[in-house]
Amino acid sequence: MRVAFVSSEAFPFAKVGGLADVVGSLPQALQKQGVEATIFIPWYWGLEGYYVGDGYFNFAGGREKFGIGHLGHGGVRYVLIGLPDFARDKPYGYDDDFRRFVRFQMAVAELLGGFDLVHCHDWQAALLPLLRNLGWFRGRTVYTIHNLAYQGIWGSQDFYAWTGLPGETYYGGGLEHRGAINLMKCGIVNADSVTTVSPRYAWEITTPEGGEGLDGVLRSQRWKLRGILNGLDTEYWNPATDRYLKHTYSIDDLSGKYQTRAELLAEFGLEDRSTIGVVSRFAHQKGIDLILEAVPGLMELGVNLFVLGSGEPNLERSFAWVADRHRGRIVYVQGYNEPLAHRIYAGCDGFLMPSRFEPCGLAQMIAMRYGTPPIVRAVGGLIDTVQHWETGFLFESMDAGGVWWGVNEFLKHPDRQQVALNGMRQDFSWEKPAGQYLELYRGLVAHG
């Protein structure tokens, strides 16, 4: 079976968030089960692909040329789509993002002949199921929602001038939502199957509270909606072989974890107390502001905080301020540092994730694999992966009191080492999720 994956991100070539980890890992796992996988991503600035030729697509009344490049990683072929729009410093954050990714998808559609199935990821690939239904290419389509909050919304006049699509697709093709083009809705309505990244999140997005304005659409399409829990790259995230750890360790010998902890605290001047790690984007979704509000209570509980992350400038400034005020108890490192992230997962005693919503979450899986019990809000994929008092700690309230309660539960557990060992025994590999996707693919292709 030949399967094309279309995404704006794929590790290790383009990563902003967890989408990249999924698209980088799932095809590799599927290849081990007999799938011939190809990943299509934009040819971002700095990617050193092998140029193989040019392609053409119709856009805004003219004929547009795009470059085609190839890369390989983990036995999977990557196809790079070269457009001038993507020769920039970062994948997103530009006023013309919508237009850029519409062009990307129209170019990709020209190369999808011969695939049995096309697996589209988030709004940046959500137009493709409609293009398939309009006859641009053949093969079945799966659309995966990684984060419903980002929907790809734009005015209709520009869109139809660019694409030349039939005007009746505005309503009949599922593009219209609340008076604008909504690519997320388009993908949901037109794909043969819709998945999201955890069973709990698949339910949450059908509710008014979690549906981001699309809950009615999702309820109407519930018959083809399925939650498949993401896996983790357990070869990369492995405390026994981690290249970023000076002292590796395993479930049978935790001495390397204790050495990593001692060196981490000493290097950053933290007191020898229970230390809670945070590795996160500073975004409203992640509940980072709740940690700030909980700082006085957490200091009274006697824990340290070690925070690595960046994002909203006001949160960065606030963490820098509290870290300065609580020297020896709070460390804040701005930005993302891969080696330091590994040391935090390994060297902290607990790991905090107070997310407002969390489609799946990978950090809690990594923390458990590294023997660091996660303290998480009971939402989305966190519910599906963490068992309270068994492999970690869950709290309900979306406020500073909830954060305090979760950390206090962690502190009062009589055998936190057993919780850590239970977490290390969990299987978060891609083998099971890949099998579930393969079952889905086979069913769709057989009835295509």
Predicted regions and their residues:
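Catalytic cores of nucleotide-sugar-dependent glycosyltransferases that transfer UDP/GDP/TDP-activated
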Residues: 1-448
